[in-house]
């Protein structure tokens, strides 16, 4: 931990949030047990990672209760402090959010991962109406909104625990405010409070089961198939090459959202595992796909397109993999999305600094396997994170190509707002690094109802029945996890 003198020196350099860090051994705890001890209240989060579906990432992140958060819907933003609105803004929320983020000047913490605090939460799909370079082409008509969640919700994470899964160490981080005369002492006292919480045992909320319920489609199978045929008409007319319609499913769910996270991380480990407690609703997800990642001046997108079910035996698994890589439709769709990714990254990258890596590799998850590629670029000078978001949002894999025309068609054919689905979840650090996943394989739990949404990439030779089945396959992991909880994880 830095000394009072080091703290004062950093304050003199103009930093207005200064991290105090305490390193402890926590090898007898898991990220889940640490979350239960330190967080497990509204406006907290747990972020984990399993690389390539098979290997746990080195770091997990636990957000302690956030006193400040932003909610944006339409052209209005509310800033909350301890549950009370303390600031409001009317107009495009994105410049305001960027300016809010930029209020905080922090020094980097050596030897820790790139994320050590900042904004954490989501940008819902309807954020598209705030990107001025294409919003004028969208109608933004009033649609049914069964979830009623904010378009954007971001927490200001100034107290967190970073778990090093390799060493068994935990790093407790509390940001001090040097504008407060006793800011250093307050932060030290808060760290001691957190250490006290760590020493206590946590009450494990047992999942003993509840009544079994089935998921019901909001769209319906036949209307969805008709939607696929309508999109194919647009494709044959030359309007577009691909569109990704989606359908939402819902089911009664009265169990713990944290139990759902436990089931999902066991059933479908993915590069982005996340649990957000937003008070009146929870987001529980296991996304395989980056929307965009910024590390200093490098930017990465990772299109995923092409899906097969996992085999029941190693031989069947290999056969499904070979079948996927030899499927002309799936390959054509994936190549199209690589090109779209190159175009998106190219808009914000230096000339000649865009490259495709990991071209068309197979990644395997619990229920499905995908074709995956990497597109990387070196940012042009002066690019902001909102420039990056504007260039890459929404993901081509959740909209189609050309992207704007595909979004117009989605707006026409889908019956309700997408909400969080198809948007982005993740972190935007104080250091300006950003790591956002696409909000897929994601449940929203609100008012004793679980919602999950999934889409299918429609191209010229799509079969409506197959596309319907693809949406079922993609939702299967979340629905299965919910039913595992209903059966009881701890019976």
Swiss-Prot record:
This protein's UniProt keywords: Amino-acid biosynthesis, Aromatic amino acid biosynthesis, Lyase, Magnesium, Metal-binding, Tryptophan biosynthesis
Pfam families: Anth_synt_I_N (PF04715), Chorismate_bind (PF00425)
Enzyme type, top EC level: lyase
This protein's record includes keyword Metal-binding: yes
Catalytic reactions on record: chorismate + L-glutamine = anthranilate + pyruvate + L-glutamate + H(+)
One function term, GO molecular function aspect: anthranilate synthase activity
Entry EC number(s): 4.1.3.27
GO biological process: L-tryptophan biosynthetic process
SUPFAM superfamilies the UniProt entry points to: ADC synthase
Binding sites annotated in the UniProt record for L-tryptophan: 49, 271-273
Activity modulation notes: Feedback inhibited by tryptophan.
Cofactor(s) demanded: Mg(2+)
Residues bound to Mg(2+): 333, 470
Assembly, per entry: Heterotetramer consisting of two non-identical subunits: a beta subunit (TrpG) and a large alpha subunit (TrpE).
Function summary: Part of a heterotetrameric complex that catalyzes the two-step biosynthesis of anthranilate, an intermediate in the biosynthesis of L-tryptophan. In the first step, the glutamine-binding beta subunit (TrpG) of anthranilate synthase (AS) provides the glutamine amidotransferase activity which generates ammonia as a substrate that, along with chorismate, is used in the second step, catalyzed by the large alpha subunit of AS (TrpE) to produce anthranilate. In the absence of TrpG, TrpE can synthesize anthranilate directly from chorismate and high concentrations of ammonia.
Entry similarity comment: Belongs to the anthranilate synthase component I family.
UniProt protein name: Anthranilate synthase component 1
Provenance organism: Neisseria meningitidis serogroup C / serotype 2a (strain ATCC 700532 / DSM 15464 / FAM18)
């Amino acid at each position: 931990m830095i000394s009072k003198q080091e703290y004062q020196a950093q304050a003199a350099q103009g930093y207005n949030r200064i991290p105090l860090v305490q390193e402890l051994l926590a090898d007898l705890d898991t990220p889940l047990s640490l979350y239960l001890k330190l967080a497990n209240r509204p406006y907290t989060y747990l972020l984990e990672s399993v690389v390539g579906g098979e290997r746990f990432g080195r770091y997990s992140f636990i957000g302690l209760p956030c006193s400040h958060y932003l909610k944006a819907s339409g052209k209005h933003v509310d800033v909350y402090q301890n549950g009370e609105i303390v600031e409001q803004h009317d107009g495009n929320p994105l410049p305001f959010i960027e300016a809010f983020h930029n209020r905080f000047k922090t020094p980097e913490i050596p030897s820790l991962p790139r994320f050590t605090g900042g904004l954490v939460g989501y940008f819902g799909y309807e954020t598209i109406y705030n990107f001025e370079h294409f919003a004028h082409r969208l109608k933004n008509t009033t649609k049914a909104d069964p979830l009623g969640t904010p378009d954007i919700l971001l927490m200001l994470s100034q107290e967190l625990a970073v778990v090093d899964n390799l060493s068994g160490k935990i790093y407790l981080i509390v940001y001090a405010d040097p504008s407060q005369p006793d800011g250093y002492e307050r932060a030290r006292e808060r760290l001691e409070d957190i250490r006290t919480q760590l020493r206590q045992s946590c009450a494990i909320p047992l999942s003993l089961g509840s009544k079994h319920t089935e998921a019901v489609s909001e769209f319906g199978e036949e209307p969805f198939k008709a939607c696929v045929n309508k999109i194919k008409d647009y494709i044959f007319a030359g309007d577009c090459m691909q569109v990704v319609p989606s359908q939402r499913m819902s089911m009664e769910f009265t169990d713990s959202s944290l139990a759902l996270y436990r089931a999902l991380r066991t059933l479908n480990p993915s590069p982005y595992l996340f649990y957000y407690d937003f008070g009146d609703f929870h987001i529980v997800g296991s996304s395989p796909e980056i929307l965009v990642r910024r590390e200093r001046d490098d930017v990465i997108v990772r299109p995923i397109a092409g899906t097969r079910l996992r085999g029941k035996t190693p031989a069947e698994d290999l056969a499904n993999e070979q079948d996927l890589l030899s499927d002309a439709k799936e390959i054509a769709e994936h190549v199209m999305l690589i090109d779209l990714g190159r175009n998106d990254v190219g808009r914000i990258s230096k000339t000649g600094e865009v490259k495709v890596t990991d071209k068309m590799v197979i990644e395997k998850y619990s229920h499905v396997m995908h074709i995956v590629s990497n597109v990387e670029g070196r940012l042009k000078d002066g690019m902001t994170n909102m420039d990056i978001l504007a260039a890459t949002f929404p993901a081509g894999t959740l909209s189609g190509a050309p992207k704007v025309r595909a979004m117009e068609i989605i707006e026409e054919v889908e019956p309700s707002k997408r909400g969080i689905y198809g948007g982005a979840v993740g972190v935007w650090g104080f250091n300006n690094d950003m790591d956002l996943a696409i909000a897929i394989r994601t449940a929203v739990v609100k008012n004793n109802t679980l919602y999950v949404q999934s889409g299918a990439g429609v191209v010229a030779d799509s079969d409506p029945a197959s596309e319907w089945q693809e949406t079922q396959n993609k939702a299967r992991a979340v629905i299965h996890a919910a039913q595992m909880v209903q059966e009881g994880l701890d019976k």
